[in-house]
Every structure is written in C-alpha cells, then in structure tokens.
C-alpha cells in the first residue's frame, strides 16, 4: 500500500463521512489506480454505492473485492466484510434468497455472531414467504379429491401423500386436517391424527367432523372417556347429531364392559405413571383417602385438578 494510495483513501473516507459520494468515488478510484491490489479500496467504493442505493454496482465491487482479496490472501475478515455487504445489497432489493447465500459465504470466512442471528431470522422469513407463495386453494381441492379417491380404495399411504400436499396448498382449511386425520387413523398413527383433529377444531370450532373424527381416533385407542368427551363436544355443536349421540352410548357401554381391564390399560399410560410417582400427588391422594372432603381444596389448583381428572378417567380414583 503506497503512501499516495493511502492519502487518496483517507480523502475518500473524509468525503464519505460528509456524504459527498461523488468526491468519495473520485478519491477511491485514484487509490485503486495507485494500488489495485488492496481489497480495502474496493470495499470502500462498494460502501459508497450502497449508500447511494446503487445496489448492482455495490455487488459488482464486492465481487471485485473478494477476487482481489483471494489473489492477495487478504485478511479473511475483509473478505467476509465484502460478502456481507453484497448480502445487504441483495436484502435491500428484497432478494432474500441471494442475500442469505452471500451471508453464508461471509460466515464461512468469519463467524460474526450478529450475522448468524440475522441469517436465522432471514431464513425464517424466506420459509414463510415460500409457504405463502405455495398456497393455492384450487390445487388443494384437487389434491383433496385425489386423496379421497385413494382413501375409498383403501390405499391409505397414497391418500396421505395427496392430503399432505393439500394441507401445504391451503394450511388454513379445517376440512383438510379432518380428512388427513381420518387417513392417519386408518394407518394407526393415532397421535398425529389427534393433532390434526385439534388443528381442525382450532381452525373451525363449528365443524362437527373434527370432533367426531377425534372421538373415532380415541375409540381406536380405546380411550373411552376421552372419546366420550369428544362426542359430547360434537353434540355442543349439533345436539341432534345421531353419530355423536350413538358414539356417547357406545363409549358408556365400553367403559362398563370390563372396568378392571380398562384400569389396567390406563395404569400403563406414562402420564398416569408420572402422576403417581409425584411425591406431592401421592400425599394429596393419601389425604383424600383419609378425608374425602380434602379434594375440594385441591381442585382449586388448575394443575392438580387436571391431574386428578386424569386419574379419575384412568379409574385410579373415584370422584363424584
């Protein structure tokens, strides 16, 4: 780096600080002419273009800075700086994909913690934008119809592929989650089916099939009490729904058929086992056995209430 080149760079920096960008360009150009092997001069000129919102020119000089930096084995931080600025230029142009590419290149040279955070946030934005761009209710309907055809044929794996695609195309459509839940139940993937039923209900609390399919899934899992509640929720939507009314009756019969067997199955539930291992809950249960009236105080605590309801449904305790 010659003294004359440094002097021109300093003059360029002074002009840059005063936002006299035209003058800054003149001095940086002279510095480059005097010492074309210095990455800093190209980086500085790229910074001027960035401030001028001339982003294409900014990227061009960032690329030149990287090229010169590689040839001269410049400090990796300076190369990373050029790459990061190119990323910023693409971000300003709303080209997040290219921005992220340049930021990753920069991070491969120097792992700046702030840039790591920025990239994570941009990648979230990119994924959200991609999902939004993918949404197409008409194509979702086509995929749903195809899924229904394969479902009727009993080809549930193929039906699932179409239902998955339908959900991606229209993720706010409650009916699609209901259909996929029915398919998952056939495939005996009960937890995923329940998740889809819950999503369906969240999206449209008046769509009765969401509750009925949730109940059907719970019946398949032999969770009679939970299934009964799901059918009862369906009846809140439509009190005259015969499928839900019949479902409640069947659940009551199933619960009455073999209580000891049902209790044994419920005791195998990891959630029930965890509650029974809890020293605090064991103390509460002991209090309840000695003084049944003690339960009233404990029911005021929402967390304990939920645990006691779980134990009641499992047949471990009786509450009236």
Curated annotation (Swiss-Prot):
One matching Pfam family: TPR_11
Transmembrane helix recorded as keyword: no
Main subcellular location: cytoplasm
TPR repeats: 5-38, 40-72, 80-113, 140-173, 175-207, 208-241
Membrane-spanning intervals of the chain: none
UniProt-annotated location(s): Cytoplasm
Region annotated Disordered, chain positions: 241-269
Induction: Up-regulated by heat stress (at protein level).
Molecular function terms, GO-annotated: ATPase inhibitor activity; Hsp70 protein binding; Hsp90 protein binding
Phenotype reported upon loss of the gene: Reduced brood size and decreased fertility under heat stress. Decreased thermotolerance and shortening of life span by 68% and 77% at 20 degrees Celsius and 25 degrees Celsius respectively. Growth of gonads is hampered resulting in shortened arms of the gonads, abnormally shaped spermathecae, lower sperm number and endomitotic oocyte development.
Keyword terms, alphabetized: Cytoplasm, Developmental protein, Repeat, Stress response, TPR repeat
Basic and acidic residues bias locations: 242-269
GO cellular component: cytoplasm; protein folding chaperone complex
Gene3D superfamilies: 1.10.260.100, Tetratricopeptide repeat domain (1.25.40.10)
InterPro entries per record: STI1/HOP_DP (IPR041243), STI1_HS-bd (IPR006636), TPR-like_helical_dom_sf (IPR011990), TPR_rpt (IPR019734)
A biological process from GO: reproductive process
STI1 domain residues: 269-308
Tissue specificity remark: Expressed ubiquitously in the whole body. Detected predominantly in the pharyngeal muscles, vulva epithelial cells, striated body-wall muscles, spermathecae and intestinal cell ring. Also observed in the tail regions of hermaphrodite and in the sensory rays and spicules of males.
Function, in words: Plays a role in gonad development. Up-regulates longevity and thermotolerance. Binds daf-21/hsp90 and inhibits its ATPase activity.
Subunit and interaction comment: Forms a complex with hsp-1/hsp70 and daf-21/hsp90. Interacts with daf-21/hsp90 (via the C-terminal MEEVD pentapeptide).
PANTHER family: STRESS-INDUCED-PHOSPHOPROTEIN 1 (PTHR22904:SF523), TPR REPEAT CONTAINING PROTEIN (PTHR22904)
Protein name: Stress-induced-phosphoprotein 1
Biological source species: Caenorhabditis elegans
Protein encoded by which gene: sti-1
